[in-house]
Design a protein with these regions (language model features):
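Acidic, low-complexity intrinsically disordered segments
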Residues: 6, 45-85
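Short strand-coil-strand connectors
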Residues: 14-18, 40-42, 63
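A short, structured beta-strand/loop element
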Residues: 27-54
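Negatively charged, low-complexity tracts enriched in Asp/Glu with abundant Ser/Thr
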Residues: 1-30
Length: 85
């Protein structure tokens, strides 16, 4: 029986000129591993993002994200790699 490690962490990532706390949680689904990421904006609205592993790179599935989140997405893959080592 395989043991699946629960991965959950927070990372401060600079977006829109300030540090924001992005919360990452990994789940293992039928189609492979998925990271669920959430972050809140200045008004307290929470955004939920799903990342899937494609060609050894974590890619965002959601469209129409605010520009400051799209700007931060490039930092997600290194943050995940750092935790999984």
């Amino acid at each position: 029986m395989a043991v699946l490690k629960n991965v959950q962490f927070s990372k401060l990532i600079k977006a829109e000129g300030r540090l924001r706390e992005f919360n990452f949680r990994k789940s293992n689904g039928i189609a492979g591993p998925v990271y669920h990421v959430d972050v809140s904006d200045d008004r307290g609205n929470r955004y939920y993002i799903n990342l899937h592993l494609e060609d050894n790179t974590w890619t965002v599935q959601e469209k129409n994200l605010p520009p400051w989140i799209q700007e931060a997405v490039v930092q997600f893959h290194p943050a995940i790699q750092e935790q999984e080592v």
